[in-house]
A protein has these predicted regions:
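Structured C-terminal subdomain patch of bacterial secreted/periplasmic proteins
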Residues: 92-162
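Short helices/loops that flank or line small-molecule/ion binding pockets
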Residues: 81-93
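Alpha-helical, coiled-coil/dimerization segments enriched in small aliphatic residues
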Residues: 43-80, 134
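Short secondary-structure boundary/capping segments
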Residues: 23, 54, 117-119
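Short, conserved beta-strand edge motifs with alternating hydrophobic and charged residues
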Residues: 30-36, 67-68, 98-100
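N-terminal post-signal-peptidase region of extra-cytosolic proteins
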Residues: 77-84, 111
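Extracytoplasmic substrate-binding proteins
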Residues: 1-41, 136-162
Length: 162
């Protein structure tokens, strides 16, 4: 059983490496995996690398935005909650925002007086993962989900890169 598990992990690592090679323009981009409630834009949360969602992105070669990390009071916390008033400053070094939501999320961000000034929002570099969809679950990876959804996840991210 141990040997089979090690082989599965090695095969998955190879799959990730081969898949990432098809997306060279994503390498080194800063990405914030957020929770933004379009019905209440008074604050938002960003999952840090202590959370599997944030760690997965750094494992895929993305960087974690420094200005978000600077907001973290507790360096062991899995997320940092930020007041909307600080959104523009906090997300100014973020190339891509990923958030859960629906087909109304981007429109809500673009109409909001503050979030509309965030460079990634203004320039259309926001990936919205359907809260009830496979990608929303797959951004919390397992060795079994990676092969099923990695290409779809990277395609969604790649689609917003300018």
């Amino acid at each position: 059983m141990k040997t089979e598990g090690e082989k599965l992990v090695a095969d998955t690592d190879n799959f990730i490496k081969e898949t990432l090679a098809k997306y060279p323009n994503l390498a080194g981009k800063s990405v914030a995996m957020c929770y933004i409630n379009a019905a209440d834009l008074s604050n938002f949360s960003v999952y840090r690398t202590a959370d599997p969602r944030g760690a997965y992105l750094t494992d895929l070669g993305f960087t974690f935005p420094e200005k978000i990390e600077a907001q973290a009071q507790d360096k062991n916390a899995f997320y940092v909650q930020i007041s909307a008033e600080l959104a523009v400053e906090s997300l100014s070094d973020t190339d891509i925002i990923i958030t859960y939501g629906d087909d109304k999320t981007i429109a809500a961000l673009q109409k909001d007086a503050i979030f509309s000034k965030v460079p990634a929002v203004k320039e259309g570099r926001v990936v919205v993962l359907d809260s009830n969809g496979n990608l929303a679950a797959a951004c919390n990876p397992s060795v079994l989900s990676v092969k099923a959804e990695l290409v779809n996840y990277l395609d969604a991210i790649n689609a917003v890169v300018k």
